[in-house]
């Protein structure tokens, strides 16, 4: 029987595990070469036991929760299978560094390279230290829509990047030869390896201090405690079957063809089952994700609803959760489905799970949120030396849904991306031929309600040199819904401005291989969150604050909230407002009539005229 430490020592071990993953994270931030790692923080680090169970995941990208543990387990199986079949000694040893970017293991795209170091104590394999991080380039097409995984870049199977402490030069040379900016790739590679090695050293130091038995017993106790907390929260949800449906705009290939998102949640005592069987089949465009991502979005929703503040995130967090996800769904795609923009659809699955459970636990869910990274992929040649530059020029925050008792958060990264950050304006302008003209809140974008949805943002980026522009923005048509009478938030938008005046909005958020010339600008507008509760019940003092801060306009205050102003002032006439609110209960103004209109929609003729310049530039650039 496993011997467990006393509660005090268990808490010391708990905090030791959290400290290890936080130090791994800090180490990677300070040594990585790519801005998407050291600024945007598109990575996650973690510790796993000898069977691949999650021990501690660093605060980072929640969507990597399942992918990392699944990858570690598959690595264990892989080397066991090879050793058994070939009857040779090719197992896992001290000094090994394992690596893969297999999209169908991680559930994400090929840019996510995962490095894993085995941890040994007294000659036995006891744990793993791992890091999954986004490389800016992994080969493959730069622009346009990919139709299969083979066009998206290098696929690295499970191999050893280091064998018993010695570098595998074949692997390292292969990477250098096949990426566009090898010095950056090798810098990020070495940063990840340093981070996972540090995690292994710190874990061994924890064992040296408290003993292997105490550390393993402490980990088991932590998992059991986390499980008990989660089960307690599930028991508080009324038993039943809860369903909800939403959609994605399209897959980027069949324009305008909606992609169904349907979830069924079953609660029975202290167990929850999330069934994604009726989610749409995998699609032609690159918006598919693997099974690990489909299950991760269920885990993200479950963690939010049961134990959002419990640290570290570990295997016990999800023991009360069953997930039904057949292969071949858009979030359980199989080879060779393209997966470059893997992260987009799972965000709406999380939203839809909350929507399904809203009737059962209205006090624990939020309305719909903007649910997209609003990322633009840019590439061009530097005017001064002709060198290629690449940038994911987005990661802007939007509005989160309101909840019972609180307005939604504004300018916040979407739920599945957790601790990722937007890159500082100063860094972007210093490193790339871009000028950020504006990055601010979007007035009137939050859905009206007793509690108002968070505001989206607007980012205007002017070209200081020619470059190619690609946007992969979703939820333009599927707006963040409100709950219990709350209005929807505004949708996401993508626009361009050619010259100083003319701005036109794309009818879709999916814009591929469009050339912008010096002086042109692209504009990303993140949607606002949905409101919660009827707008006519919003306290007038909150509306006054919103007006003062510029969050809403007079038009929104009058139309959605039934406000009457005194004369030509911004002072609210309280008595007149109460009378008007009573009248509006029976004849409310439709929310769509009050949406902000930032720009005209681009016609097909407009687009043809604006983007006839790209062919010669493509030849120069790529």
Q: Where in the sequence are the language-model features?
A:
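Glycine/proline-enriched, intrinsically flexible loops and inter-domain linkers
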Residues: 1-121, 125-622
């Amino acid at each position: 029987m496993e011997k467990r430490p006393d509660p005090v020592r268990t808490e010391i071990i708990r905090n030791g595990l959290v400290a290890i993953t936080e130090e791994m994270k800090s180490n990677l931030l300070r040594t990585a070469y790519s801005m998407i790692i050291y600024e945007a923080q598109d990575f996650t680090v973690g510790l796993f036991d000898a069977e691949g169970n999650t021990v501690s995941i660093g605060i980072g990208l929640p969507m990597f929760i399942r992918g990392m543990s699944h990858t570690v387990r598959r690595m264990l199986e892989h080397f066991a299978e090879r050793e058994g079949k070939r009857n040779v000694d090719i197992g896992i040893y001290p000094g090994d560094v394992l690596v893969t970017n297999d999209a169908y293991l991680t559930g994400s795209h090929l840019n996510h390279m995962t490095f894993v170091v085995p941890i040994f104590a007294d000659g036995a394999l006891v744990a793993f230290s791992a890091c999954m991080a986004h490389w800016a380039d992994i080969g493959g097409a730069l622009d346009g829509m990919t139709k299969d995984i083979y066009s998206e870049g290098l696929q690295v199977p499970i191999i050893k990047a280091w064998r018993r402490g010695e570098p595998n030069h074949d692997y390292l040379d292969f990477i250098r030869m096949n990426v566009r900016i090898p010095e950056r790739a090798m810098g990020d590679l070495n940063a990840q390896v340093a981070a996972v090695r540090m995690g292994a050293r710190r874990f061994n130091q924890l064992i040296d201090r408290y003993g292997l038995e105490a550390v393993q017993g402490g980990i088991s106790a932590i998992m059991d405690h986390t499980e008990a907390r989660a089960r307690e929260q599930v028991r508080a949800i009324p038993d039943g079957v809860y369903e909800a449906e939403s959609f994605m705009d399209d897959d980027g290939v069949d324009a305008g063809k909606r992609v169904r998102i349907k979830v069924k949640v079953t609660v029975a005592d202290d167990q929850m089952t999330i069934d994604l069987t009726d989610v749409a089949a995998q699609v032609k465009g690159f918006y598919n994700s693997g099974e690990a991502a489909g299950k991760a979005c269920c885990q993200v929703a479950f963690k939010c609803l049961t134990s959002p503040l419990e640290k570290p995130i570990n295997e016990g967090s999800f023991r009360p959760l069953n997930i039904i996800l057949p292969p071949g769904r858009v979030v359980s795609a199989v080879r060779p489905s393209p997966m470059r923009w893997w992260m987009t659809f799972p965000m709406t699955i999380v939203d839809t799970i909350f929507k399904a459970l809203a009737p059962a636990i209205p006090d624990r869910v939020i309305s719909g949120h903007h649910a997209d990274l609003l990322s633009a992929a840019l590439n061009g040649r530097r005017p001064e030396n002709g060198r290629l530059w690449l940038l994911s020029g987005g990661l802007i925050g939007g509005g989160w849904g309101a909840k019972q008792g609180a307005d939604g958060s504004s300018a916040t990264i979407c739920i599945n991306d957790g601790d990722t950050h937007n890159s500082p304006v100063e860094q972007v302008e210093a490193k790339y031929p871009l000028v950020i003209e504006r990055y601010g809140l979007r007035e009137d974008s939050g859905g009206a309600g007793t509690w108002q949805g968070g505001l989206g943002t607007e980012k205007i980026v002017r070209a200081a040199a020619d470059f190619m522009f690609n946007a992969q923005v979703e939820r333009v048509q599927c707006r963040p819904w409100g709950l219990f009478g709350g209005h929807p938030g505004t949708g996401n938008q993508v626009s361009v401005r050619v010259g100083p005046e003319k701005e036109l909005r794309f009818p879709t958020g999916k814009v591929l291989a469009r050339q912008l010339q010096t002086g042109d600008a692209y504009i990303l507008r993140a949607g606002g969150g949905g409101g919660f509760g009827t707008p006519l019940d919003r306290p007038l003092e909150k509306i006054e604050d919103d007006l003062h801060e510029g969050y809403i306009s007079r038009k929104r205050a009058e139309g959605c909230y039934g406000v009457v102003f005194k004369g030509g002032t911004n002072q609210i006439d309280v008595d007149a407002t109460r009378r008007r609110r009573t009248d509006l209960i029976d004849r409310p103004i439709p929310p769509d009539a009050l949406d902000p209109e930032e720009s005209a929609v681009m016609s097909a003729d407009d687009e043809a005229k604006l983007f006839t310049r790209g062919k010669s530039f493509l030849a120069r650039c790529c």
